[in-house]
From Swiss-Prot:
The keyword Coiled coil is annotated on this UniProt entry: no
Keywords tagged on the record: Ribonucleoprotein, Ribosomal protein
Origin organism lineage: Bacteria, Pseudomonadati, Pseudomonadota, Gammaproteobacteria, Alteromonadales
Protein name per Swiss-Prot or TrEMBL: Small ribosomal subunit protein bS21
Superkingdom of origin organism: Bacteria
GO biological process, one term: translation
Family: Belongs to the bacterial ribosomal protein bS21 family.
Entries under NCBIfam families matching the protein: S21p
Gene3D superfamilies according to UniProt: Ribosomal protein S8
Molecular function terms from GO: structural constituent of ribosome
Record Pfam families: Ribosomal_S21
GO cellular component: ribonucleoprotein complex; ribosome
Species whose genome carries this gene: Alteromonas mediterranea (strain DSM 17117 / CIP 110805 / LMG 28347 / Deep ecotype)
InterPro entries listed in its UniProt record: Ribosomal_bS21 (IPR001911), Ribosomal_bS21_CS (IPR018278), Ribosomal_bS21_sf (IPR038380)
Length: 71
């Protein structure tokens, strides 16, 4: 859990913004959404495999786009 110490003479809004930013960096909200419901191990493996496949295809598309000559 991210901790933000409020500095002297610091407005509450600024401290809240820093806290939200640190939560976003730490991935707290995405972790909460992921753990909201129980995910069977088979579903988890399936989701991770699909994500890996998507990353791989994206990487291949980037490499192929670099090789295409525009002239």
């Amino acid at each position: 859990m991210p901790i933000v110490k409020v500095r002297e003479n610091e407005p509450f809004d600024v401290a809240l913004r820093r806290f939200k930013r640190s939560c976003e960096k730490a991935g707290v909200l995405s972790e909460v959404r992921r753990r909201e419901f129980f995910e069977k191990p088979t579903w988890e493996r399936k989701r991770k495999k699909a994500a890996a496949k998507k990353r791989h295809l994206k990487k291949l598309a980037r490499e192929n786009a670099r090789r295409v000559k525009l002239y």
